[in-house]
Amino acid sequence: MSSRIESGRKAKSDGHKKEGELSKILTEKTGKFHTNEGVGGSKTKIDIFCEELLKYISQKSCSGKNTQVHLTSTKIWCEYFKINEDLRLWFDQFFGLPRSGREGRLTKSQIDDDLNQLALDWFNVNKMNVFDVIVRHGAYKTDGQVKKGDAITHMIWYNKETNQIDKEVTVEYLANLVRGGKWIMNETTLHFIDGNGNKRFHLQMKGSGGLSQKNSMQFHIYKVC
């Protein structure tokens, strides 16, 4: 077994353990049973839930200012949003074809200005739909079709070192931050800036990890202060 596979499995195991610890904290805090059993995995945003409170939680732990919130292929993304023709070409150029690595993608200055503007306009016109996919419910290939997943209601930033909650917000709180903001395009990334000038998300080409994940669309979320 390769060291990459082994470390990936360990990370998943550690993550599940931390979700269990947070579930206990939330149960003690609210007096209502929270659990991470029967949820999680690569096709859901839900890490912890409480049926009695109708709370469906995504747990985030970040050592820095941001952490991954969504990872998907351009194929799944474009299929979900029914993107084709010139706009589809931009996605193939900016992120590169699957498994082509950094050498297979183009940067903003290497792409036609009209295509870049087409893409930026699309992200801003569809900013709430983009938010729903990357934060609220995801988009996953199931039974041969790309469908949205089950929606979360809350996001919690959890400090794995101290086993304490840093911040808990509702998805609607995050959605309201998005409504007044906009996407901007840089040479190799897109950034989302809210109405107060704070960076909330960025989108980059995944360049690390196994070849099968390279050239994927990797979204990061910034911790709410």
Give the location of each predicted region.
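Nucleic-acid endonuclease domains
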Residues: 1-45, 49-52, 59-225
